[in-house]
Design a protein with these regions (language model features):
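Helix-rich effector regions associated with P-loop NTPase G domains
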Residues: 11, 37-55, 67-87, 123-124, ...
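Catalytic P-loop NTPase motifs of RecA-like helicase/translocase cores
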Residues: 104, 134-135, 165, 239-242
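N-terminal accessory targeting/assembly segments
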Residues: 1-107
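Canonical P-loop GTPase G-domain recognition
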Residues: 133-187
Length: 314
């Protein structure tokens, strides 16, 4: 039988067939997939082949094959820096939720996420949430950031999960697609999903005052069928986002505004640091490229995993 993985709890996987039958499945032995050293061999969104077995009137499945993934979102595991974690696979688009405060989402985090999405060919839409709570100065920050990312080619939408602002617009973009929702803990993912589909009634928790971060309410990624011909993958809140092994020469290719200028650089292997006649550095000097983007690029290039969490708005 063939089905799609809707939920992973580490050892058991919830798999739904095209007929809508749900099986609890596990894997036997070790799965090695394309040399990906991931902590989870099977991810939500995977299409798998499995066989059923019945013991004591309980039917479960054993997964024996994973179909090739069209794409996936992957990040470094928090505890095992050399290992990776596949958050979800076979995604049509990702909605990355961003909040300016309560908790703050820094540009370094946004850019790391976007680089990974570009590398694995996943379309990303930026949702600026909680705009009903912002004063004019904070709204100016939203407008500035939206301008930076729209200029590069990303869709940016200001929303409020609480008031419903632009929720219908987001729903219209989801029809007929598998959409993953991601972002820091506390940015309002569960509240947004509940606004999109109230019957799901996902748990929400308030922001931790001490750390200005949300309490984790989603422990594992999970896919849901929605009433308007759409599927959603809700993911755990992410604190940091480590970019997975990329050659230094290729990182710039996943910054679309850098890639567009690459041919104009004097050297075809230009890293855009201190090489002469670098088109990217010239564009930066003329304010055609945002400094925050260039700073993120340098941090990824240097393998800097920590400082991006504390950078300032500039």
């Amino acid at each position: 039988m063939t089905g799609t993985v809707y939920k992973s709890t580490g050892s058991w996987y919830t798999v739904k067939t095209s007929l809508g039958t749900v099986y609890q499945c596990r894997i036997k032995g070790k799965f090695r997939i394309q040399d990906i050293k991931s902590t989870n061999p099977v991810a939500v969104g995977d299409v798998v082949d499995f066989e059923t077995e019945t013991v004591d009137n309980e039917t479960t499945g054993i997964i024996h094959h994973i179909h090739d993934r069209e794409n996936y979102i992957i990040r470094k595991s928090v505890n095992l820096s050399k290992q990776t974690h596949i958050i979800a696979s076979n995604i049509d688009q990702v909605f990355l939720l961003i909040t300016i405060n309560n908790p703050p989402t820094f540009t370094g985090f946004i850019d790391r996420f976007l680089v990974t999405a570009e590398a694995y060919d996943v379309k990303t839409v930026l949702l600026f949430n909680k705009i009903d709570t912002y004063d004019e100065e904070t709204l100016d920050e939203v407008r500035f950031l939206a301008h930076v990312y729209r200029k590069i080619g990303y869709d940016c939408i200001g929303i409020s999960a609480k008031t419903g602002k632009n929720i219908e617009k987001v729903k219209a973009m989801m029809v007929g697609k598998i959409s993953m929702f991601s972002g820091h803990s506390g940015v309002g993912k569960s509240t947004l999903v509940n606004a999109i589909e109230p019957s799901l009634d996902l748990k929400t928790k308030e922001i931790s005052e001490q750390h200005m971060q949300g309490q984790h309410t989603t422990t594992f990624a999970e896919m849901f069928d929605l009433s308007f011909n759409a599927r959603i993958i809700d993911t755990p809140g992410i604190k940091g986002f480590g970019v997975v092994d990329m050659d230094k020469e290729e990182i710039g290719d996943y910054f679309p505004e850098f890639f567009a200028l690459k041919q104009q650089c004097k050297f075809n292997n230009c890293l855009h640091i201190d090489e002469p006649k670098c088109a990217v550095k010239e564009a930066l000097d003329h304010n055609e490229i945002a400094f925050s983007r260039y700073r993120s690029y340098l941090q990824i290039l240097e393998g800097d995993e920590e400082t991006y969490r504390t950078d300032n708005w500039e």
